[in-house]
Amino acid sequence: MEKAKRSRTAIGMACVCAAVMAAGGTAAPPQMMVVAGSGVAGFADGVGAEARFNKPIRLAPFGPDAVLVSDIFNHSIRSVSKDGRVRTIAGAPDRKGHEDGPAATARFASPHGVGTTADGRIAVAEAEGHTLRLLTLKAGVAGGYEVTTVAGTPGKSGSADGPALQAMFNSPHAALWGEDGSIYTPDIGNATIRRVRNGVVDTVTGSGSDKMVYPMDIAWMKDGRLVVADAGANLLRTWRPGEPLGTFAAQGALATPHGVAVGPDGMLYVADMKSQRVLAIDAAGRVTTVAGVEGQAGSDAAHLNRPAAVLVHAGWLWIADLDNHRICAVALGR
């Protein structure tokens, strides 16, 4: 009975987007659902509108039907399932800081990025702490995860490659796993993409002639290239080892691209923060609106308020609606 009640709560939060003229077409965006959160900042686990976030900013897959959320001002990592159930994995708003150990007592300072592996490891880009953290499943540990620092110098910003725990970052904003177990992060204060591999940090792009302005998020494309949302240049950049930076979407099409994701068909999705929309970009560069209304922030059925991240997972396009303190989604393939 309780499960059915909670499912109805999540389904009842579905909200239909208004018809919006999309760039390159006239079709209305698909329906957008509010999965969890109510538009009010706070900290609470629960189901649907009972849950509270305070600036949810990044997303990652978490099992077959849920996502992880980095919740900035709650200094925590949360999970959200498709039925709207929210629980805290690690951190808490009253535990800002840097402390490793069991997830139940670990401390984070404004976690911005989160990335997961199939075997359950969770990487966290801690923007204010200037570190990369790792959560590993461990039986008998309070909270179920052990938290360790894998790169960076806690509380100290800078730009230094080398041994991981001696390296320095300046506000890492995302965490993306490579096939070889490396962790990639856009280091926005240094305008570079950094990598942690085998205990060593190096800069893979952004230095020399490969200049970026404000690399905010990264994702893997189907052809193995890394796509970078450069919010400062209003561009999507692409990178492959041994090649110079490329450009995927022409300048003028985007307005502060803050998050990027790739669908199974190769479609790119962008959380275009300043335009208040989520966009889809196909292989030919055609741009369409998936959610939101251009230039209009709001919290009603048709609007977003500074969309920060997107993720394709479990048949949905998930959206971190930053200033509405909620997680939304669009069902794909309809």
Language-model features, listed with the residues they occupy:
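Short loop/turn segments that connect beta-strands within beta-propeller blades
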Residues: 80-85, 136-141, 196-200, 239-244, ...
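Residue-level detector of Asp-centered blade-edge/turn motifs that repeat once per structural unit
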Residues: 61-64, 116-119, 177-180, 220-223, ...
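Short loop/turn segments immediately following the C-termini of beta-strands
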Residues: 72, 127, 137, 188, ...
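Gly/Pro-rich loop segments of beta-rich domains
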Residues: 29-55, 85-110, 143-171, 200-216, ...
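Conserved beta-propeller blade signature
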Residues: 66-68, 121-123, 182-184, 225-227, ...
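Blade-level signature of beta-propeller repeat domains, shared across WD40, Kelch, NHL, RCC1
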Residues: 306-334
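A short loop-to-beta-strand structural motif that recurs across blades of beta-propeller domains
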Residues: 75-78, 85, 130-134, 146, ...
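Bacterial Sec-dependent signal peptides at the C-terminal "C-region" and cleavage site
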Residues: 15-30
